[in-house]
Amino acid sequence: MDAGDASRLGESLDAVSAAFQSRVMELQELVLARNMYPATAIPDLAAVDVSLTAMEAQLQAVRRRLQEEREAFPKAKKLVQQSLKQQRRLQLMLANMPTGMREDVFATPLEHNSSMMFPESLNFSSAVPEVRDHDLKIKEEPTAPPKKGRGPAPRWYISTEELDSLSSYMRGRLTLEKVNIAINEVASYADGNAHLVACPKKKLSEDTWEKALVLRDIAARESVKGKHFFLETDIKGPGLKLDTTGKAILTVLRHLGRFQETRIGHHRVFILSKQQ
């Protein structure tokens, strides 16, 4: 039932109520005509009045209920739209996920059952086991947890359309899988750096503490504060190296807005962008 149906039903109930009241008035006149003495007509009229009052109360209750449902329609519609938008986003992420990472999608159960929803119509690789929706979760890289109060580093994978939109010179021999594996790898670098920034000194070795001090100084800069980042010196493979292919991948990711690049001191800093 939509809002228009509810409105028409309310109008129909008004018409029924008016017809009922008209019929009661006719019955009252007939009772008076049948009973020549008012004393004998009063009990009949009282019984009719009681019945009418009960009917009116029921009609009012129905109208209130219809009004409540009509007011709930916009909220329900908005919720459905948000659910569809989230579903499309997850479908896009899954469609552009590297095949080498899909096996990890089903590794552990969800921490929050409502955080991931995959439609049953999606067809996965035959190597992926059949599972139920509440068993799905993208496995995080085995890095230390990020700073408390901050979520994991964004993994904004590129789509086939974005890769095809690049010039052949920029794209070169890059594939969707190579680029998205690199995205996952740099996000793991950023997660590791966030952990070092938040970790107390007593839990770090002397060498690691020196790096943590450098990262904390960078994280305190206004352009970096509150964001996930990694350094050029973090890039050590295996999915991304500072070779010709790795530099081409960094150029593509910068062009597609996956990160912003800046220089702080003698460090080349890459600040990850969140998906719009």
From Swiss-Prot:
Domain of life of the organism encoding this protein: Eukaryota
UniProt keyword list: Coiled coil
One of the GO BP terms on file: regulation of microtubule polymerization or depolymerization
Disulphide linkage map: none
One cellular component term from this protein's GO annotations in UniProt: mitotic spindle
Any coiled-coil regions, as ranges: 48-78
Family membership: Belongs to the SKA1 family.
Protein name in the entry: SKA complex subunit 1 homolog
Organism field: Oryza sativa subsp. indica (Rice)
